[in-house]
């Protein structure tokens, strides 16, 4: 039996085989003055949207978002079929839980046994990998969650679609209090319906959601009240923490959840700029010129989270998914002091061997004259602490 067959659902009471979106009747009355609003997108501190040296978001004639760089090529149905039919799958994920436990152990996060330790102070920055693109980041007196994915499948149904081969290290009920969630785009492995419902059930309007342009209505229909929807280069903050700026920055990807909604929602990365630390979350992306713009504008970053998996075959995946060498180039472009690898070791979404991404990452680092501690790998549930005073990491 697969290890996830008996795993706890992230949803409050039952599985959600389909997206039956609902809106709470009291979503406005109980919002505490923080109900979602597109007016909240107005910049309060920084505004680079009108400058000539940054790439703005762009729509095609059909009103849908497009990638504005020559590094992009549209995903076509013939190419999808060629990939699915003609290319060999080398992922080789073992069916044995014992072998998976040996190769990709899932650790119990520190905050389960010691919840009082959650929340670093002042200069500290701690990152915990919870699988795929989900990180818990503690910085500048805030606790953040990126692209929360706690369900068994990355799919509109929990009965079919890509199934995770490593369980989440914790449940949503075991998380410490989360201040904000960063969503990069609306694909099912990054925007998980059950996880959104469960987080909203637990934290309600106290939890601020930062989402791309076009996603506000979907979030509201899920009952989320405290949602900030941003375009590229727009920014906002968490109430009571206005010294930390959240900027929605570009990436090269695409969006889709249904047959007819291609690219009606924007995609992107996040730059979190605090008085002590700067954190960059790349989300899901191919390599493009945007990262050099981000590095020049907001770098250096104390920590960047950059995807390294789901990259084969390159003729098809390179436009939408960075491979380990692309990831190192992104690390350099955004001027990251350290980076953590994400988007690997959880779902088999492409054709490379499931253990290959870290190997290829270390090879790329050596070619670029970098060390493994510059761009590091975490086990599921593992944390690292970055002290910006001496730049030393401590495992937790």
Swiss-Prot record:
The modification N-acetylmethionine is found at residue 1. It catalyses: an N-acyl-1,2-diacyl-sn-glycero-3-phosphoethanolamine + H2O = an N-acylethanolamine + a 1,2-diacyl-sn-glycero-3-phosphate + H(+); N-butanoyl-1-hexadecanoyl-2-(9Z,12Z-octadecadienoyl)-sn-glycero-3-phosphoethanolamine + H2O = N-butanoyl ethanolamine + 1-hexadecanoyl-2-(9Z,12Z-octadecadienoyl)-sn-glycero-3-phosphate + H(+); N-hexanoyl-1-hexadecanoyl-2-(9Z,12Z-octadecadienoyl)-sn-glycero-3-phosphoethanolamine + H2O = N-hexanoyl ethanolamine + 1-hexadecanoyl-2-(9Z,12Z-octadecadienoyl)-sn-glycero-3-phosphate + H(+); N-octanoyl-1-hexadecanoyl-2-(9Z,12Z-octadecadienoyl)-sn-glycero-3-phosphoethanolamine + H2O = N-octanoyl ethanolamine + 1-hexadecanoyl-2-(9Z,12Z-octadecadienoyl)-sn-glycero-3-phosphate + H(+). Residues 1-41 are annotated as: Disordered. Zn(2+) 1 binds at residues 185, 187, 253, 284. Changing residue 224 to S: Considerable decrease in activity. Signal peptide: none annotated. PANTHER family: N-ACYL-PHOSPHATIDYLETHANOLAMINE-HYDROLYZING PHOSPHOLIPASE D (PTHR15032:SF4). This is N-acyl-phosphatidylethanolamine-hydrolyzing phospholipase D. It comes from Rattus norvegicus.
């Amino acid at each position: 039996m697969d290890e996830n067959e008996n795993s706890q659902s992230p949803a409050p009471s039952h599985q959600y085989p389909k997206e039956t979106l609902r809106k709470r009747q009291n979503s406005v009355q109980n919002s505490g003055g923080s109900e979602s609003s597109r007016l909240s997108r107005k910049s309060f501190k920084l505004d680079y949207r009108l400058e000539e040296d940054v790439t703005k978001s762009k729509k095609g004639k059909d009103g849908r978002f497009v990638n504005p760089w020559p590094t992009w090529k549209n995903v076509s149905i013939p190419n999808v079929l060629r990939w699915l039919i003609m290319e060999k799958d080398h992922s080789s994920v073992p069916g044995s839980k014992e072998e998976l436990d040996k190769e990709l152990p899932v650790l119990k996060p520190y905050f389960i046994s010691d919840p009082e330790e959650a929340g670093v102070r002042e200069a500290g920055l701690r990152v915990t990998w919870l699988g795929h693109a989900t990180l818990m980041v503690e910085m500048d007196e805030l606790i953040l969650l990126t692209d929360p994915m706690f369900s068994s499948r990355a799919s509109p149904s929990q009965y079919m679609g890509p199934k995770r081969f490593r369980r989440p290290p914790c449940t949503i009920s075991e998380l410490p209090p989360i201040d904000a969630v960063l969503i990069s785009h609306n694909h099912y492995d990054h925007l998980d319906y059950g996880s959104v419902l469960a987080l909203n059930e637990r934290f309600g309007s106290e939890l601020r959601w930062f989402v791309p342009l076009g996603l506000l209505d979907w979030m509201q229909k899920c009952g989320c009240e405290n949602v900030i929807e941003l375009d590229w280069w727009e920014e906002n903050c968490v109430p009571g923490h206005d010294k930390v700026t959240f900027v929605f920055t570009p990436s090269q990807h695409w969006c889709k959840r249904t047959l007819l909604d291609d690219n009606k929602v924007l995609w992107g990365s996040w730059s979190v700029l605090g008085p002590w630390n700067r954190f960059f979350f790349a989300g899901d992306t191919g390599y493009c010129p945007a990262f050099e713009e981000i590095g020049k504008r907001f770098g250096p970053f104390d920590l960047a989270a950059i995807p390294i998996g789901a990259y084969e075959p390159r003729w098809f995946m390179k436009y939408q998914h960075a491979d380990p060498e692309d990831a190192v180039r992104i690390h350099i472009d955004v001027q990251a002091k350290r980076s953590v690898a994400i988007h690997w070791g959880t779902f088999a979404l492409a054709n490379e061997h499931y253990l290959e991404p870290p190997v290829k990452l270390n090879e790329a680092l050596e070619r670029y004259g970098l060390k493994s501690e510059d761009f590091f790998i975490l086990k599921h549930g593992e944390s690292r602490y970055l002290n910006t005073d001496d730049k030393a990491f401590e495992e937790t």
